Amino acid sequence: MRIILLGPPGAGKGTQAKLISEEFSIPHISTGDIFRANIKEKTPLGIEAKRYIDNGQLVPDEVTIGIVKDRLTKDDCDNGFLLDGFPRTVAQAEALDEFLKGINKELDVALLIKVPEEFILERMTGRRVCTSCGASYHIRFNPPKIEGKCDICDNELIQRKDDTEATVKERLEVYSKQTYPLINYYKDNGIISEVNGTESINEVFGNISNILGRDK
């Protein structure tokens, strides 16, 4: 089973990716993780990627594609994989398809977790983190017993910079510009499947499992 996981920031992709990986015994491949691994191991591609990152630049497609291709040749990908964070553009999607075709494989499904913008804004801007122990809360879904105070250590709770409304809206705008053409690309290829990401974790995973069961 070869899967692409798509969805906006705050859609719960990380949670679902872990569940899918465990249920279907395939590696969860996050581009962020493999970038960090290559940089840590000082591979040629990792060194090149670090140069762009250190200068505050986007890593070019050819470097990103090279790192992903290298990861997909590992033995644990023989029976499938779950890609999270790649591809981000149609050019990357085309390069991935070309690579898979070269090894007589193809994608089975592109899973899109759909969540309305207002739901994501509420989910992300409501998050709070303890400045001391790192415990996580949500002002609506998982509030602390005392407002602004950690239940565990009684220290202050803060909103991370990534979770401010302005930052979240900016991330959603970038996602829309990048990903809508990608969604249309996979629709044209007939492999996109959509799930409602506003439901509970178990309900979302149940719907995903039904889709993946059909596509086996």
Swiss-Prot record:
GO cellular component, one term: cytosol
EC identifiers of the protein: 2.7.4.3
PANTHER family noted in UniProt: NUCLEOTIDE KINASE
Keywords noted in UniProt: ATP-binding, Cytoplasm, Kinase, Metal-binding, Nucleotide biosynthesis, Nucleotide-binding, Transferase, Zinc
Gene behind the chain: adk
Task performed by this protein: Catalyzes the reversible transfer of the terminal phosphate group between ATP and AMP. Plays an important role in cellular energy homeostasis and in adenine nucleotide metabolism.
HAMAP family assigned to the protein according to its UniProt record, in alphabetical order: Adenylate_kinase_Adk (MF_00235)
Residues bound to Zn(2+): C130, C133, C150, C153
Annotated residues for binding of AMP: T31, R36, Q57, L58, V59, G85, F86, P87, R88, Q92, R160, R171
Record field: catalytic activity: AMP + ATP = 2 ADP
Family named by the database record: Belongs to the adenylate kinase family.
Family annotation (InterPro entries): Adenyl_kin_sub, Adenylat/UMP-CMP_kin, Adenylat_kinase_CS, Adenylate_kinase_lid-dom, P-loop_NTPase
Protein name: Adenylate kinase
Residues that hold ATP according to the record: G10, A11, G12, K13, G14, T15, R127, S136, Y137, E199
